[in-house]
Amino acid sequence: MRRFGVLSVILLAGCLYSLSGGGGLPRHIKTVAVIPFENETANPEVPGELHLELRKALESRLGVREAPETRASAVVTGTIKRYEADVPVGFSADPARATTARRRVQLVVDVKIVDQTTGRTLFERAAITAEGEYAERSEPAGRKQAIERIVSDIIEGAQSQW
């Protein structure tokens, strides 16, 4: 019975354990403004889709609320540097008809998160690259994969700073 009591105390203590660092943005960052990224590509859909996904992920994964730039604790800015679509990945098995079965998109962005209270750069990374594969004539599906991966890399990068 004594062993059960000791084991219970150890298990409960483990439930109360938490990390003081590495958990995201500094405590005073409660709101964030995501400025639409500059678009250096010919694709008009990427900026809007990336903006929407990043706003949702910051709230759900980092627990910050969206705010206008003038009232936000932090500001996210960036540039979409490259978007390449229609890169052939897989071909049909029929040698008589060499058609592409799968294609790939590649997305490259630069991003910066700045603490507006202190002026300090919280996270900055150039040339974050992600890819997405899609079936013939389904580019939006591949683009969605690439955007989700970019957003995930940004969130994980911001979390790892603390």
List each model region and its residues.
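A periodicity- and composition-biased signal for non-globular, repetitive helical segments
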Residues: 8-9, 61, 149
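Conserved acidic
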Residues: 42, 46, 50, 101, ...
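A structural "domain/chain start" motif
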Residues: 14-56, 68-71, 85-88, 114-117, ...
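Short coil-to-beta-strand
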Residues: 122-126
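Surface-exposed short loop/turn segments
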Residues: 60-65, 70-121, 131-143, 152
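Sec-dependent bacterial lipoprotein signal peptides
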Residues: 1-15
